[in-house]
C-alpha cells in the first residue's frame, strides 16, 4: 500500500467468489511447505564476508601482500567488480623495506614483513568503519628476527590508541583489544616496529566483541527475526571451484584463495562449520551444495562424513578435533549447481554428467543413506531462456530433446535423487522471442512488470506437466521440485515486493510438487553497511507471508479472468497467464493448520485503487477479523540502515462480516477471517 499516494477508484468492482466446501477434500490442496520462504546464500565475493561475517579487516591473511598505495574503487555499475572489491594493506615506509616471505609463510603462499630501522616500518589498512563506544577484540600472528616490540595503532581522526606486544623468532598469536572513540568510516589500523632486523605477520583479525561465533550480532538478529526456514549454500556457481577442506580447522591456518568464479578473494574464514553453526543460530535448516564441477565422488562422501559422521569415523574425528563432537545431521544435499550451464566450472555433456551424478549419489548415500538429494534440473523453460546451449534457428528447447537436462536426469538418474532443482532470473521489461532466441525490450504496465517471476514459475509448472507424461512415476508425488534460486529486480524497493507477493501466489498453486524456494540472495532480506543493518523492503514481504498467511491452500474462483497471453507459449511465456480470476487483482486463500482461520491474500499490482466483493461458501467467520498490510511511502521506498524504515507491516482490526473491500494502489494485504465457534 502506498501511503499518501494519489489514486483513482475503479468504476466497476471486481466480484470474486471464494469457495470452501464443507466436503474439505475437494477444494483443499497439499500444505505449503515453509521451505517456500527459504533463501539462497552464495559465498561468492563479499556476499557473506561483508554482511553476515564480523571480520573488520580485509585480506587479513595477506593474499595480495602489501601495496604501495590504495587502489581506486571500481565503477559501481560494474556489479561483479564492486562485489569483489576489498581494501588492501599499504606500506608504511619505503616499499624497499617491505618483503614477502614465500619460503616459510605462516599461511597461504606468503607472509609479509618489514625490515626495521629508526623510523617506523610496517603496513596499514584504511577506511575502517567503527561505532563509538563499541569494543573490538582481535589477534595477530607475529614473528621477528630477534626480540622486537611491535606497535598496533588504531587511528580515528585526531584520536590514536596503541597496543604494544612482543614478537620473537617463533610464530606467536597475541590478543589485543580497542574501544572505538568515534563513529567513523575512515579509521586506520597500523602494524609497525622500529629497531633492527625484521618482523613478519602471518594473520591479523579484529571483530566487534559482541560477535556471535564470528558472525555480526546485528545481522544474526535480523536473520533470526526473518524466521528463515531453510538456506541453500554455499553456492551457486561458486561451489564448482570450491574446496571445503580449505575451510575447516584453525581459521588462521586456512589458506586464502582466489575464487575464479567470482574473481574475488576468499579468506575461507566463514567455513563449513561456521556456516552450519550460523544455521543453528538462526534456527534454519541447511541445504548444503556439493562440488560436482571440479569435485569428485570421494570428496562428496568425505564431506557427508565430516558433517554427519560419528566422531569415531575418519572425518567425524576431524570434526570433533575442530571442536564439534556431535554430528550436524544435515539432511538436504544439493549435488551440483547448474551443471547444465556451459559457464559452469567442470561442465560436461548431459549424458556424461548423469554418470558422474550417480557416482556421487551412491558414494554419499553409502556414508549416510538418510540424506535427501537435490539435483540440477534444467527444465526446458530455463534451458530455452539462456541457461542452455544456444543453437541458431532452434532457440526453443523441447521436452525430451538432447538439450533438455531435466529429461536426462529423470531418464538416467531416477532413484538417485529426491528432487529436481530449477532456477529463474527473469530480466525486467524484456521478453524472450522464441523465433530468434533473443530478448527484446517491451513496455510494461506495473501489473505486467510485477508478474514476471510468477510467469516463470508457471512455465516451469507447464514443463512439469509434460515430464509427467513421459515419466508417470512423477504422478505419485514423491519426486519434488526445489525452486532454489529465484529473484527479480535486484534493487530493493517497495515495487519489487509486488513481484515477490505474486510469485508466492503462484508457488502456492503448486504445493503438490514445489517443495522449496530459495530467494537470491538471502542477504537481500537485509540492507547492510559495515556497522548497522535493517530488514529490507523485500525482507518485509517475506515476513508478511511467512508470519500471516495460512498453510493449507483452498480453491477460489472469480468473474474477471486474467487476459490471454500476448505471446506464444514457451520460454518465459506460460500457456495461461498467472493470477486468479479476479483481474487486475490477484487473490489466494489458505486455512491455518488448525483450520480455525481463513487467510486471504490480496495484491493490487496496479497504480489505481480497486474494489473487490468477497463471498465465502462453507465457511462461517466471526465478526472480528484482522488485516496485515505492507505499507511503503512510494514504489521506490526502501529501508536504509540506521534510518527510519520506509516500508513496514501494519495491522488493524476489520469487520469480518464485510464483503466489499477497497484496495489502494500497489497494495499487498492479508486478511484473517476467524472461524465462528
Residue ranges and their predicted role:
Residues 18-268, 285, 301, 351, ...:
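Extracellular and organelle-lumenal recognition/adhesion modules and their flexible linkers in secreted
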Residues 619-663:
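Acidic, Ser/Thr/Pro-rich beta/coil linker or hinge segments at domain junctions
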Residues 141-145, 179-181, 547, 603-605, ...:
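Solvent-exposed strand-to-loop "edge" motifs in beta-rich extracellular domains
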Amino acid at each position: 500500500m502506498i501511503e499518501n499516494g494519489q489514486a483513482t477508484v475503479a468504476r466497476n468492482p471486481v466480484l470474486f467468489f471464494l469457495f470452501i466446501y464443507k466436503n474439505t477434500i475437494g477444494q483443499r490442496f497439499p500444505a505449503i511447505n515453509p521451505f517456500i520462504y527459504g533463501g539462497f546464500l552464495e559465498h561468492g565475493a563479499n556476499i557473506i564476508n561483508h554482511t553476515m561475517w564480523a571480520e573488520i579487516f580485509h585480506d587479513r591473511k595477506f593474499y595480495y601482500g602489501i601495496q604501495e598505495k590504495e587502489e581506486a574503487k571500481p565503477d559501481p555499475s560494474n556489479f561483479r567488480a564492486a562485489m569483489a572489491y576489498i581494501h588492501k594493506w599499504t606500506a608504511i615506509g619505503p616499499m624497499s623495506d617491505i618483503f614477502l616471505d614465500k619460503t616459510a609463510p605462516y599461511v597461504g603462499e606468503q607472509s609479509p614483513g618489514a625490515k626495521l630501522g629508526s623510523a617506523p616500518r610496517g603496513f596499514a589498512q584504511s577506511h575502517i568503519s567503527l561505532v563509538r563506544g563499541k569494543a573490538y577484540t582481535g589477534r595477530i600472528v607475529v614473528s621477528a628476527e630477534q626480540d622486537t616490540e611491535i606497535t598496533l595503532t588504531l587511528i580515528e581522526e585526531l584520536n590514536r590508541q596503541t597496543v604494544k606486544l612482543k614478537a620473537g623468532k617463533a610464530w606467536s598469536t597475541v590478543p589485543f583489544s580497542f574501544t572505538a572513540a568515534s563513529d567513523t568510516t575512515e579509521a586506520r589500523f597500523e602494524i609497525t616496529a622500529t629497531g633492527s632486523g625484521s618482523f613478519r605477520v602471518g594473520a591479523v583479525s579484529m571483530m566487534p566483541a559482541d560477535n556471535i561465533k564470528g558472525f555480526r550480532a546485528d545481522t544474526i538478529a535480523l536473520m533470526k527475526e526473518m524466521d528463515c526456514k531453510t538456506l541453500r549454500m554455499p553456492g551457486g556457481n561458486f561451489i564448482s571451484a570450491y574446496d571445503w577442506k580449505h575451510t575447516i580447522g584453525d581459521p588462521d591456518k586456512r589458506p586464502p584463495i582466489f575464487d575464479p568464479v567470482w574473481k574475488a578473494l576468499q579468506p575461507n574464514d566463514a567455513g563449513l562449520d561456521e556456516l552450519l553453526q550460523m544455521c543453528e543460530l538462526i534456527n534454519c535448516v541447511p541445504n548444503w551444495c556439493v562440488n560436482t564441477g571440479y569435485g569428485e565422488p570421494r570428496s562428496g562422501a568425505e564431506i557427508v562424513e565430516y558433517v554427519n559422521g560419528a566422531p569415531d569415523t575418519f572425518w567425524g574425528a576431524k570434526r570433533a578435533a575442530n571442536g564439534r563432537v556431535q554430528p550436524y545431521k544435515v539432511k538436504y544435499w544439493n549435488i551440483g549447481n547448474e551443471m547444465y550451464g556451459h559457464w559452469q566450472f567442470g561442465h560436461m555433456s548431459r549424458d556424461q554428467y548423469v554418470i558422474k551424478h550417480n557416482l556421487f549419489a551412491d558414494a554419499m548415500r553409502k556414508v549416510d543413506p538418510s540424506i535427501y538429494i537435490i539435483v540440477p534440473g534444467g527444465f526446458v523453460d530455463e534451458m530455452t531462456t539462456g541457461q542452455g546451449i544456444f543453437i541458431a534457428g532452434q532457440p526453443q528447447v523441447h521436452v525430451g530433446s538432447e538439450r533438455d537436462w531435466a529429461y536426462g536426469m529423470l531418464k538416467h538418474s531416477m532413484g538417485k535423487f529426491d528432487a529436481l532443482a530449477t532456477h529463474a532470473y527473469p530480466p525486467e521489461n524484456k521478453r524472450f522471442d522464441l523465433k530468434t532466441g533473443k530478448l527484446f525490450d517491451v513496455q510494461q504496465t506495473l501489473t505486467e512488470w510485477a508478474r514476471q517471476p510468477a510467469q516463470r514459475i508457471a512455465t516451469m509448472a507447464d514443463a512439469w506437466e509434460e515430464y509427467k507424461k513421459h515419466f508417470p512415476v512423477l504422478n505419485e508425488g514423491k519426486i519434488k521440485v526445489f525452486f532454489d534460486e529465484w529473484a527479480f529486480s535486484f534493487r530493493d524497493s517497495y515495487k519489487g515486493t509486488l513481484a515477490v507477493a505474486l510469485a508466492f501466489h503462484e508457488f502456492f498453486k503448486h504445493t503438490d510438487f514445489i517443495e522449496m524456494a530459495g530467494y537470491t540472495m538471502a542477504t537481500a532480506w537485509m540492507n547492510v553497511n559495515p556497522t548497522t543493518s535493517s530488514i529490507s523492503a523485500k525482507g518485509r514481504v517475506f515476513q508478511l507471508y511467512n508470519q500471516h498467511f495460512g498453510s493449507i491452500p483452498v480453491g477460489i474462483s472469480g468473474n474477471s479472468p486474467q487476459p490471454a497471453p500476448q505471446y506464444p507459449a514457451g520460454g518465459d511465456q506460460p500457456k495461461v497467464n498467472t493470477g486468479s480470476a479476479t483481474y487486475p487483482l490477484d487473490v489466494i486463500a489458505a486455512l491455518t493448520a488448525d483450520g480455525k482461520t481463513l487467510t486471504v491474500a490480496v495484491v493490487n499490482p496496479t497504480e489505481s485503487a480497486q474494489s473487490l466483493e468477497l463471498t465465502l461458501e462453507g465457511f462461517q467467520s466471526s465478526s472480528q477479523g484482522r488485516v496485515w498490510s505492507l505499507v511503503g511511502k512510494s514504489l521506490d521506498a526502501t529501508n536504509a540502515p540506521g534510518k527510519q524504515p520506509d516500508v513496514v507491516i501494519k495491522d488493524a482490526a476489520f469487520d469480518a462480516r464485510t464483503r466489499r473491500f477497497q484496495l489502494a494502489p500497489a497494495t499487498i494485504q492479508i486478511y484473517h477471517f476467524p472461524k465462528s465457534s
